Amino acid sequence: MLCEDQHMSVENTPQKGSGSLNSSASSISIDVKPTMQSWAQEVRAEFGHSDEASSSLNSSAASCGSLAKKETADGNLESKDGEGREMAFEFLDGVNEVKFERLVKEEKLKTPYKRRHSFTPPSNENSRSNSPNSSNSSANGDAAAPKGGNNPHSRNSKKSGNFRAHKEEKRVRHNSYTSSTSSSSSYTEADPAILSRRQKQIDYGKNTAAYERYVEMVPKDERTRDHPRTPNKYGKYSRRAFDGLVKIWRKSLHIYDPPTQARDTAKDSNSDSDSD
């Protein structure tokens, strides 16, 4: 009846790609679609690429990988071989010396003195006294040089002599203790404005009670270097230097300042107390 009409029939022979599922109540047949080979093959099939192209790409990638491996292996071998290498440097100083001498002989290069190495002994030809910049000529150097070779004492004496000569060449500044007049007119001050200013400074220092007491206590014949001396206004000084001399002179005159009234009263009080 109704149950028999609704009964589903199941074929005995299963179709290709289909499966059957049996249960106690009823039997249901399920069809299964054929599976594709892979997702990549589907993409190639859509774009029209064949399996030959994919195989060629795979083979080219494999060949590139093998080449990279070979290159790394070769680099490792070269680095191992390079560890055993030795490098040698050769400095050609002699070539420069030969070139320098050739240029000097051809008069293409002129030097004030000849080059001499530190390990070669000094000689008359290689000595620096032959240079035009040296103070002593080669003849004077040969005459002054001792027979026994280089003497350090002679070198020191030469240096001291040159230093003294250089000091003598400098301008000599005459202070108030040397002499009132200089030996040369070039070292005397002749500007009337400067002389009048210096005279005012000297007069200002002399117009003090300390200078008057100094003249009374110490005559000119008994004065020594320790006593204050009036600065020489004719000396060749700068303005700052002469002002410094005047300052020192007036400071030394303060020793002869007269005692103040307070000191006198203190002395009187002390004398009265002693007498009592």
Swiss-Prot record:
Region (RNA-binding): 191-260
Modified residues (Phosphothreonine): T120
GO cellular component, one term: histone pre-mRNA 3'end processing complex
One Pfam family linked to the record: SLBP_RNA_bind
Region listing for Disordered, in residue ranges: 1-35, 50-83, 104-236, 254-276
A Gene Ontology BP annotation from the UniProt entry: mRNA transport
Bias type Basic and acidic residues, positions: 68-83, 213-229
Residues annotated with Phosphotyrosine modification: Y177
MF-aspect GO terms: histone pre-mRNA stem-loop binding; mRNA binding; RNA stem-loop binding; sequence-specific mRNA binding
UniProt keyword list: Developmental protein, mRNA processing, Phosphoprotein, RNA-binding
Chain positions with Phosphoserine modification: S24, S29, S118, S123, S127, S131, S182
Highest taxon of source: Eukaryota
Zinc listed as a keyword: no
Quaternary structure, from the entry: Interacts with Sym and Cpsf73.
UniProt record similarity statement: Belongs to the SLBP family.
Protein task: Involved in histone pre-mRNA 3' processing and couples histone mRNA production with the cell cycle. Both maternal and zygotic proteins play an essential and vital function for development.
Protein name: Histone RNA hairpin-binding protein
UniProt source species: Drosophila melanogaster
